[in-house]
Structures are given as structure tokens and as C-alpha cells.
């Protein structure tokens, strides 16, 4: 059965160290007068029945940003900012729905139909009831890029992910490879543009 909105909990990943931005909290940097995280929440919330924010710093600030959407703050249970899989694990453990939709806090243009398209792909015969659906894009030159932190995942994967992390593994694609994963191609690569530096943020502000 194709998952619908009420079966999906959204997870905005805002738990990183922002090293390429000089260590600032990336989701709290402003674009057009609002934090990047606020832009993402506005696009993510309508696609989900419940909402979580993975934040390892400034939880009170993120709680205030998430309050209009009824969002709950979750934090990594592993020390040392081990990467997006730790945020995913916190989300999988906390969600009370069958599916979790993840997106990073630095992608203010994420598609309004992200959940619907990933859910449709998980339910296809070819996907054979996939465990994970994730995103690829194709640029004007025909080059394909994978965007693994945009994903729809079954929350039953939590124990397997915990074991993977306990073994010292950290790579998102390596964990996906353990499961039935389907890739969904989006033609608008700009929707998945993520901001990695203050210069990129400034450029987007002027665009």
C-alpha cells in the first residue's frame, strides 16, 4: 500500500556542525529574512502527518521555529556529531508512523511533491515494496547526482541502522545498500540545491 500523508513523519536534519560554514548552525542562517530551517519546514510540513527536527545545538531556537508546525526536537544519541545517519536513527526511533521522510535544513527549495513521488516509487511493482526511496537528479549535461539525505524510509529499519552505527559505519549509501532501495529521478536539480557556504547563501539571497 502506498504511504499517504498520515503514514509519514517528516524529519528535518539540522544536527550537523556546519564545518563548511565556519562552524555556524547552518539551519539558523537567514535567507530573505527567515532562517533556512523555516523555509524547509514550510515545505516539509504539508507533506507529513507529524514533524521532527534533528538538532544537536540550539534546541530552544529550533523548538520555536517548529512550534507552528507542532514539531518535536530530537537529538543524536551518539556522541561527536557522527553524521546524518545518527539524525536518521533518532528520527526512526521517535516516529510513531510507518514511514519517515528526511530532508536537510539547508535546501529551501525542496519540492512540494517530494513525499508523494517517493511514496509512489516505493509502492511500484518494480520496487517490490522498497524499504527506502531516495532522490537522484539529472543536470543539463545529463550528469546524474544522488541526494541520499532526501529519503523516505520504513521506520522498521531503526534496529538495523543502530547496529550499523554501533559497528562504526557512517556512510549513508553503504547503509542503503543493505536494503531494497529505489531511486527517484527529479528533473529540477535546483530544488535540491543545498547551501554549503556563507558565500553560496549570499549568492542565493541576491538571485
Which residues does each PLM region occupy?
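Nucleotide and nucleotide-moiety/phosphate-recognizing core
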Residues: 2-169, 174-193, 198-203
